[in-house]
Amino acid sequence: MAKHKRKGLEGTGKESKRQKITPAEETPRTSEAGPDKETASTLVQEASPELSPEERRVLERKLKKERKKEEKKRLREAGIAATQTAKVQTLPAKPSAATLALEYLQGWAQKQESWRFQKTRQTWLLLHMYDEDKVPDEHFPTLLDYLEGLRGSARELTVRKAEALMQKLDEAEPEDSGGSPGKVQRLRQVLQLLS
């Protein structure tokens, strides 16, 4: 029976501990932050004889919210844009599709264990392999090696597109439609490799 009484006393002890916390004890914490907080804690202390502990906590929360609003307002006026630009600078920029595809190709060439097939990267490489700006000359031999292993419909489609592009360039050659010699050379290399 005595144990039950002690449990009952502990339960009330917890409640009384909550009630014992007064704003006066919290004053050192609040006074460290600034003058606005000091005035808020004095307001709570002045009202403490009249207010219950619950009402004091509610009042403290309201005052804390008001302080936060004022602080945000001051920051906005001071130029919060500076902090926003700092956040933007800390975020890493996403790599472009070109860099991702070229890294994919280099990973394949080095036979890295982390390399795995990615259809989107392969598609990008197949679409842009004739463009010297997007796939530099230094990466093109590696791309040709990659194309040797190309299988299935991707291989057939690449051959068809290369043949169609070659016919288009041959027909437009007398007019010189802008087919660069590098592009034509790349087309021939791809056709020789895959045909």
UniProtKB/Swiss-Prot annotation:
Record bears the keyword Secreted: yes
Chain positions found as Phosphoserine: S41, S48, S52, S96
GO cellular component terms attached to this protein's record: extracellular space
Main location, first listed in the record: secreted
Name the UniProt record assigns to this protein: Cholesin
Any one GO molecular-function label of the UniProt entry: hormone activity
Induction: Expression is induced by feeding and cholesterol absorption.
One Gene Ontology term from the biological process aspect of the record: negative regulation of cholesterol biosynthetic process
Disruption phenotype: Intestine-specific knockout mice have elevated plasma cholesterol levels with increased cholesterol synthesis and VLDL secretion.
Region (Disordered): 1-78
Subcellular location: Secreted
Keyword field: Phosphoprotein, Secreted
Expression by tissue: Secreted via exosomes, secreted from the instestine, secretion is induced by feeding and cholesterol absorption. Expressed in enterocytes.
Entry-linked InterPro entries: WKF
Function according to Swiss-Prot or TrEMBL: Hormone secreted from the intestine in response to cholesterol, where it acts to inhibit cholesterol synthesis in the liver and VLDL secretion,leading to a reduction in circulating cholesterol levels. Acts through binding to its receptor, GPR146.
Compositional bias (Basic and acidic residues): 8-18, 26-39, 53-77
